[in-house]
Every structure is written in structure tokens, then in C-alpha cells.
Amino acid sequence: QADISVDGVIGIGHQALNTLISGSASTVVGYLAGKNLTTGNNNTAFGYNSLGGNVTNALTGADNIALGANAGRDIQGSAEANILIGKDAGDSLTTGNFNILIGRDAGEALVDETHNTAIGADALSGSSLVDQTVIIGSQAGKGAMTADANGTVCVGYESGAAITEGAGTTAIGFGALKALTEGDNNIAIGYNALDEITTGGANIAIGTNALGNCDGGENENIAIGNNAGANLDNGNNNTIVGSNANASSGNANGQIVIGKDVTGANNAFATLGLSTSIKSIDLTSSSASWSGSSDERLKENIQTSTAGLSFINELRPVTFNWKKAKDVDKSMSQYQDSEEPALGGEGTYGKIMHGFVAQEVKSAIDKHSDLKEGFGMWQEWEDGTQAVSDGALVPMLVKAIQELSARVEELESK
């Protein structure tokens, strides 16, 4: 039927439009192209076996476009509004609708799925059960996705390349989430973001290589910044914000780390700063303060503390200067071979500071059995750095003042 034109229909090639009964505005060019189109309108096919050239069932659908050898090869029935461009693009699609598949082998395993968009060689090439996905990039989303992966978005070379199950997954960037097989609600944006994770869920990674070493079933981590959280490989529930910011260890849990080059202190700790181990928080209001829950209804075994003046007398207030990061022992995590500000923060180098020495505080604590394990003035971080929390001293100061006040009253009464 070469060079035939009926009601705006053009068919060129061996058996092209071979079974057309009625229809309008279709253009078919190629060996066996559209050979089983019977009644559909507005179909366009260019290429060997394109648009149903390999099946015996009639094609009655409309508004399909198939360009390339075997593009839409098996399409049939009432399939409509599919755009298939590239060799073997959508070649197994039979009755699916509203799919856009562009690129060699793009969406080649889809059968009767709908509303998928795949652009790139091998994009969405291994899935036969998924709907409503957006896959853009060579080899992106090429795994055997199931219906549990409906709505997946992958943009970038090999992004989401291994996904089989994973509702609510979004991967944008070269290699983002490329190893994930199953896991819900992961979001990775950036070059190789979350690229090694396999089964975790509810993670958010934004930035080049963010959470790039998570390689198991990590859950509910948030990392924002280039290389943020890159040292995590088995941790959960961490929030890490800042370029090169990291948790204290690969299996950290519940850490909050904010700041460029900052490393977390310990699990359940919040660490803020700029590449120093000494953290500070500036508040704009002079009346602002930090509050912690202290409700009686949350406590039991309440007793009057006996730790007071005797402990205070063991402490030695000191003045000191902060070193620069390049001057501390190289074994410490704070060491940096560069001209960085003092460890106390920008503007503190050379200034006389006031405080305590952590090792001396620990020695004083060890001498007082009435200081219980919940006393948090002294801490040792996972990297061995010792730290002091001055705020924990307040109850002891109050007790010391009460003891002194009682002595004064006793003296005055004599």
C-alpha cells in the first residue's frame, strides 16, 4: 500500500497500514510500520516495525507517535496518546496510555502502564509494573520497578538505576540514589547524593556526595551541603547541615551538626560552629535564654542535693588563650594544617578567656560521691576531646550559696 493517501492518511513501506479500515490524519512510513492499525486517528509512525508492526491484534487507539526501529513495536488495542522516540523505545508497550518514552530502549519493558515519562537511553528500561514516573537521564531508573515505586522521579545519569520498590522517591543528579533497591520517601539532590544506600528510607540528601557513604538500611537522616554527612555508613535520625559537616562517627544516631567543616560531638548532641570544637550561639535578644523541661510531673525520686560548697571549692577558675587549629596535637580531630581562626572562634585569638580546664573538672567530680551520674558538667566526646558545660554548675552554685547563707545567719545569731 505504498504511496496511498486516504482521508489524510499516508502509508509508505511494505505492509504499512496494511489493515487500515477507517481513520484520518495518520502518517506511517517504514517496513511493517502500523501494519495492524485499523481504525485509529492521528497516529504517526516512522521506522521498521514501529507502531504495532510486530503484533497480530488490531490497533484502534489514536494520537500515538512512534519514531525509530521497533518503537512501539507491540502497541495494540485502544492504546492512545503515547510518544515513543528511539530504537526499541516502548517496544513492549501494548495497551498503555499517555506515556512519553524518548531514547534507545527507553521504557522498553512497559506493557500496559500509563503516564510515564522516560527520556534517555535505557531510561526506565527494566520496569513493567510502574505508573506515573518521571525518569530523565541515560540508564536512570532502569531497575525492575514494581507498583510500589509509582510516582518515582529520577533525573540524571544512573539516578535511581536499581530501584525496584520505593514510594515517594526523588533522585536528581548524576548517580543520585543509584544503588537504592527498596526504600520509601528518599530524596537525593546532587552529584552522587545518597549513591550507595540500598534499602534505607525517609532520608534527605542535598548536595554533592551528601550522605554519599550510607550503604545499608539507614533511615531518617537529613544532610544538606556538599559532602554533608559523607562519613555516615550506618547511622539514623541525624541532621547535618553545612559543607563537609559530619557526624562524630559512621554509626552515629540522633546527632545535630550545623556549620562548615563541623564534626558532631556525640549521639543526642547538637553541635554548631565553624570548623572548631568550641561552639557558641549568639542571640539577638538580651532576654533570650535556653529552657529545658523541668516539670515535677516528669520526675521521680526527687531529693535535696548535698553537693555544694565543698565541690565548688575543688574547682579552679582559670584564664587562658585558645590555640590555633594548626598548633594542637595532630592526633586531635580539631587539628587543621591551615591558618584558621582560634579554636574559640573568629576574633578570640590572643584574647584572655575565662573558664575551667576539663581534666581538672573531672578530677573534682571524681572526689565527690554525692555527684550522681546525671551530672553533666563534664563530658568526653567520641573523639576523646573533653568538654565542660558550665550551665550544669548552677544547682551546685545555688546549694553553695545556701550553705554560705546558713553560716552567715548562724554567725549573726550569736
Q: Which stretches of residues belong to each language-model region?
A:
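Intramolecular chaperone/auto-protease modules of tailspike-like proteins
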Residues: 293-414
